Amino acid sequence: MTTNQTETIWKALDNLRIELPSWGFANTGTRFGKFIQLAAAITIEDKFSDAAQVHALTGACPTMALHVQWDLPHGLQDTGKVKELAKKHGVKPGSINPNVFQDQEYKFGSIGNPDASIRRKALTHILDCLRIAEALGCRDISPWFADGSNYPGTQSIRKRIGYFEEGLKEVHAALRPGQRLLLEYKPFEPAFYHTDIADWGMAMLLAKAAGPQAYVLVDTGHHYQAQNIEQIVAWLLHHKMIGGFHFNDRRYADDDLTLGSVDPYQVFRIFHEILFYEWETGKRTDIAYMIDQSHNLKGKIEAMIQTVSAAMELYAKAALVDHK
């Protein structure tokens, strides 16, 4: 390897930041159950402590994404505690994730629900999350919507599009300067007939309808088998609509395996598309790289370190491609 190549790698890695998910350090499972790990995080302080360990060993993870209902159950009242923990452990709060899928009222959806009172409940929660983000100095709000239906004819797909457009415009109008709304998509699960935001095109159209501070978030596990994710990334780059990633690997669907454990070449191709765009335009992209994984069998901290290390290695390899 030449001196220039070595310098290229170090320069690329100096700019790479990967956000850790608070929920990735806690006990998680499948619908069949979960295996308890004695070292899994229980409290928000445990999560900050574990994230700090990963950051200490990788040097690339200065922020941790928070899930409001799980990490800040008392909303704004908990922001003071979060600030103290962030200062103590040297890891800042990152993207703020609303929870509009867990409560019983969301059986038929959140902001796509045909019941106006439930749509209002979901929107009120998301607007509260914006205030939490402002209090913590967080830029990105990353809602994932499980909204959809399981059977034909049970919901009006077109009406629900309108509900989403209306609701997301209201959320966008409440964004502070510099804040971003990142819209995630997923083709299926938990809805199996139709999902309201099922692919990148739907997410992009809704983001554009919401306003200029709304972008698309790509979860690498939220795609059909053999789908060309780097082509999706290229389209979003072309339209300047890509805001972030949720990194994980999969064999079949949204398996949430450690990044690069199944298809590292795909991760390389995604990074290559982004770095090629930066080389071609001479502009750095403003993309939030985040992890979203469920470590049911592996140790939590070890799995995070594996993921970050794999991302760094593949990003470095992509940076070495000579576009001339």
Feature annotation, model-predicted:
Residues 1-134, 317-324:
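N-terminal pre-domain/capping segments
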Residues 1-25, 29, 33-36, 52, ...:
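Histidine-acidic metal/acid-base catalytic patches
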Residues 24-26, 68-72, 97-102, 145-149, ...:
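Active-site-proximal loop/turn and secondary-structure-junction residues that shape catalytic pockets
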Residues 38-45, 113, 120, 162, ...:
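Conserved phosphate-coordination/catalytic loops
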Residues 59-62, 107-110, 148-150, 183-184, ...:
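A short alpha-helix capping/helix-coil boundary motif
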Residues 83-94, 115-125, 160-174, 200-209:
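Acidic, His- and aromatic-enriched active-site or binding-groove loops in soluble protein domains
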Residues 113-118, 148-159, 187-192:
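Surface-exposed cleft-lining segments at the edges of enzyme active sites
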Residues 129-155, 179-184:
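Active-site groove signature of glycoside hydrolases
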